[in-house]
Curated annotation (Swiss-Prot):
<dbReference type="Pfam" id="PF00266">
    <property type="entry name" value="Aminotran_5"/>
</dbReference>
<protein>
    <recommendedName>
        <fullName>O-phospho-L-seryl-tRNA:Cys-tRNA synthase 1</fullName>
        <ecNumber>2.5.1.73</ecNumber>
    </recommendedName>
</protein>
<feature type="binding site">
    <location>
        <begin position="213"/>
        <end position="215"/>
    </location>
    <ligand>
        <name>pyridoxal 5'-phosphate</name>
    </ligand>
</feature>
<feature type="modified residue" description="N6-(pyridoxal phosphate)lysine">
    <location>
        <position position="216"/>
    </location>
</feature>
<dbReference type="InterPro" id="IPR015422">
    <property type="entry name" value="PyrdxlP-dep_Trfase_small"/>
</dbReference>
<dbReference type="GO" id="GO:0043766">
    <property type="term" value="F:Sep-tRNA:Cys-tRNA synthase activity"/>
</dbReference>
<keyword id="KW-0808">Transferase</keyword>
<dbReference type="InterPro" id="IPR015421">
    <property type="entry name" value="PyrdxlP-dep_Trfase_major"/>
</dbReference>
<feature type="binding site">
    <location>
        <position position="190"/>
    </location>
    <ligand>
        <name>pyridoxal 5'-phosphate</name>
    </ligand>
</feature>
<keyword id="KW-0648">Protein biosynthesis</keyword>
<dbReference type="InterPro" id="IPR015424">
    <property type="entry name" value="PyrdxlP-dep_Trfase"/>
</dbReference>
<feature type="binding site">
    <location>
        <begin position="85"/>
        <end position="86"/>
    </location>
    <ligand>
        <name>pyridoxal 5'-phosphate</name>
    </ligand>
</feature>
<keyword id="KW-0663">Pyridoxal phosphate</keyword>
<dbReference type="InterPro" id="IPR000192">
    <property type="entry name" value="Aminotrans_V_dom"/>
</dbReference>
<comment type="function">
    <text>Converts O-phospho-L-seryl-tRNA(Cys) (Sep-tRNA(Cys)) to L-cysteinyl-tRNA(Cys) (Cys-tRNA(Cys)).</text>
</comment>
<comment type="subunit">
    <text>Homodimer. Interacts with SepRS.</text>
</comment>
<dbReference type="InterPro" id="IPR013375">
    <property type="entry name" value="Sep_Cys-tRNA_synth_arc"/>
</dbReference>
Length: 392
């Protein structure tokens, strides 16, 4: 089936159990799909844009109400929807970071955090993770002291992942934020893998800013995300324009420079809005997600030579696995080499592993039913047994 000239209709989620680590939390709800069709035209949400002529103030569809609801849901004071989490990082970095300023990141930070700092002219200063791939408050304190010695001042900003993309480990964000605040360092909470999948309370964790990814964890179309702030920081990041044309004398009302005037628009925004009631409900049941994930973990660990590189027991559904001692042993002599593994799983209706990967790889069980996770667990064991690997 085609949906355009040379464009094959994508049917991955209809035909397979999808374990792709970055796709699990972004699968659309039925309501979001309907919203995309209804609001697919470019400026569709602007039908009723009136003074003050800013998108987040539109009442129909209820965009203004949605922004207030998201801020309240995260227990923050203000929020704007962004074209992806990376644009949230960018807005905050551009506001607080100047050329040569030190910015606190971690050794597990996503590349988009580095690029946001680079774009603002800052210097990346990484808190090293420990041997368990965890970033700790003590390590944060030591790094801040190191930065003070080197730069003569504390970092101007800290960007800290609650759950990192490499291991899916849950870091002590609240503890790190407490340390950073002792040095008057504002802290950005990177919730790309948490906002929309598990409960997040900005006041409790001590975040000055919360960034979430709509297309990664809020069942939303891409590119979409959220930037939420405290009231104090909202005045700075969501400041309004002050520029005036020297010939025309034109001014631009209450447009916000860090959003290039307006918040996220069109089908992406309304898709987020349509999924939001479902997202608010599902974060209440994250414990069930961990129960389902455990089923797969136990199956993988029953295959001799398999190791879980992420913290264990798991506190998140994104997991990094080392099968150098199991599935990669088969790849050494298999006629398909490492491609046999993803091929065998595809034949069993499982999609999302990088083709050819049999050593270290990641997967995500978020959103699966218990029946699906049991099927996935059995599939891993079956592939092992079919290829002569010992199973406990």
């Amino acid at each position: 089936m085609k949906c355009g000239n040379g464009i094959e209709a994508r049917q991955v989620n209809e035909l397979f159990i999808n374990v792709d680590p970055i796709q699990a939390g972004g699968r659309l709800t039925g309501d979001a799909i309907k919203a995309i069709i209804a609001y697919g035209d470019g400026y569709s949400v602007c039908d009723n844009c009136r003074k003050p002529n800013r998108l987040d103030c539109i009442a129909k569809p209820p965009i203004a109400e949605f922004h207030k609801d998201v801020a309240a849901w995260l227990n923050m004071d203000a929020a704007r929807m962004m074209p992806g989490a990376r644009r949230g990082f960018q807005a905050v970095a551009h506001t607080y970071v100047s050329k040569g300023n030190p910015v606190l990141l971690t050794s597990l930070s996503h590349y988009t955090e580095f690029l946001a700092v680079e774009g603002a002219g800052g210097v990346a200063c990484e808190i090293p993770a420990d041997s368990n791939h965890l970033v700790t408050p003590d390590a944060a304190a030591a790094k801040i002291e190191e930065v003070k010695q080197k730069f003569g001042k504390a970092p101007v900003l800290a960007i800290i992942d609650h759950v990192d993309y490499q291991y899916g480990n849950l870091h002590d964000f609240a503890g790190i934020a407490k340390v950073a605040h002792q040095y008057d360092v504002p802290v950005l909470y990177n919730g790309a893998y948490t906002v929309g999948t598990m409960p997040v309370d900005g006041k409790v964790i001590g975040a000055d800013f919360i960034v979430g990814s709509g297309h990664k964890s809020m069942a939303s179309p891409a590119p979409s995300g959220v930037l939420a702030t405290t009231a104090e920081r909202a005045k700075e990041v969501f400041r309004t324009t002050g520029i005036t044309g020297d010939v025309t004398g034109r001014k631009f009302g209450i447009k916000e420079p860090e959003l290039m005037g307006c918040t996220l628009m069109g089908a992406t925004l309304v898709g987020m809005m349509a999924s939001f009631p479902h997202v608010k409900e599902r974060v209440k049941h994250f414990d069930k997600e961990l129960v389902n994930n455990r089923i797969v973990m136990e199956a993988l660990l029953s295959i001799e030579g398999t190791k879980i590189l992420s913290e264990y027991p798991r506190k998140h559904t994104l997991t990094r696995v080392d099968t150098t001692g199991s599935f990669d042993r088969v790849a050494e002599t298999h006629k398909k080499k490492g491609f046999y593994f993803s091929s065998a799983l595809n034949d069993k209706g499982i999609f999302g592993l990088i083709p050819g990967a049999t050593r270290i790889w990641k997967f995500n069980t978020y959103g699966m039913t218990e029946k699906q996770t049991r099927y996935l667990a059995d599939a891993f064991v079956a592939v092992a047994q079919e290829n002569g690997l010992p199973v406990k």
